[in-house]
Design a protein with these regions (language model features):
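Extreme N-terminal starter segment of soluble prokaryotic enzymes
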Residues: 1-6
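Conserved N-proximal alpha/beta basic substrate-recognition cap immediately N-terminal to
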Residues: 11-116, 120
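A generic structural signal for well-ordered alpha-helical segments
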Residues: 28, 81-85, 125, 184, ...
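Residue-level detector of anion-binding/catalytic polar loops
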Residues: 34, 131, 190, 239
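Short glycine-enriched loops at secondary-structure junctions
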Residues: 69, 93-97, 191, 197-200, ...
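Phosphate-binding site of ATP-dependent enzymes
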Residues: 119, 128-130, 138-225, 229, ...
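ATP-dependent carboxylate activation and anion-phosphoryl transfer catalytic cores
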Residues: 218-287
Length: 287
């Protein structure tokens, strides 16, 4: 009997998102797995059995959440998943919620302030002539990322007015990031590959914002950071992540369906999705 993996994918995901929902199921199918793809919106619970569109899941399967679905009902869906027995997750439900965002990895970041208080952020920016990067705590695709200094107080006030319920990250600008940051894909306990993301506008390297990609090797300083994060991901039961580094600093850890597999394929002319699937299977000890 084939092992089963279930992917949760929201078909309404914006078009600048990645194609993991295509690459990863194909990779598992090549490894003789049965793959199913469901919209997280269609989840229900009957007598402690998860169903999608009235179809019960196998007693045992591997679940890979490639997204949350609608924000308003995310906690309800994750509560159902978290309390259902006999399921194994590529990344645990609790960590998808608790480790999604910059705060979970603050010890590896450059000087960083995280706050919902605009006055606290302005106080830090106004304390000198330093350059900073201001971005949403749980942002993605490089949206709403701004390079700021003490001349940009009006912009900061405007951003906080537009998003009054949002926490923001103020991070000291990393000198050298204009030359690019390195994205490293981690699966299971293995480094799958790394590539350079060079920003189009001097500091936003996200490919969705026009960043350029090329082959690279992890520098010694960046490798030290990545090698400290890999075992922590495993301890937290986070099976798939993208780790962004620059000049020996962590820029970000993305654990919610991070892009990078197709970029690795583009720059190295090699399919990394099967290597990713094998690393997940090995980490989960599934034969």
């Amino acid at each position: 009997m084939k092992p089963v993996i279930l992917f949760l994918h929201d078909p309404s995901t914006k078009p600048n998102a990645n194609n993991n929902h295509i690459l990863l199921p194909n990779a598992f199918e090549e490894l003789n797995w049965e793959t199913r793809i469901y919209n997280p919106e269609d989840i229900s619970l009957k007598n402690n059995r998860i169903e999608f569109q009235s179809e019960p899941l196998p007693t045992k399967c591997l679940i890979w959440a490639l997204g949350f679905g609608r924000k308003a009902t995310t906690l309800d869906r994750f509560n159902i998943l978290h309390n259902a027995p006999n399921f194994s997750f590529v990344t645990s439900v609790s960590e998808l919620l608790l480790s999604h965002g910059k705060a979970s990895w603050a010890e590896f970041l450059p000087e960083t302030i995280i706050s919902q208080d605009v006055n606290r952020i302005i106080e830090e920016i106004s304390s000198g002539n330093d350059q900073w990067v201001l971005k949403p705590l749980a942002g993605s695709f490089g949206r709403s990322v701004h390079k700021v200094n003490n001349q940009d107080i009006k912009l900061v006030n405007s951003l906080f007015r537009e998003s009054p319920d949002q926490f923001w990250v103020l991070q000291r600008y990393i000198e050298g990031i204009e030359h690019g940051e390195t994205r490293t894909i981690i699966a299971g306990k293995e480094i799958i590959g790394s590539y350079l993301r060079k920003p189009e506008d001097a500091f936003r390297a996200n490919v969705a914002q026009g960043g350029q990609i090329s082959q690279t090797d992890l520098s010694e300083r960046d490798r030290l950071v990545v090698e400290q994060i890999v075992p922590r991901l495993a301890e937290k039961n986070i099976g798939f992540a993208a780790v962004d580094t620059c000049e020996g600093f962590l820029v970000e850890v993305n654990i919610v369906n991070p892009g990078g597999l197709s970029s690795l394929q583009d720059v190295y002319s090699e399919d990394f999705s099967k290597k990713t699937a094998l690393a997940i299977i090995k980490a989960k000890k599934i034969s």
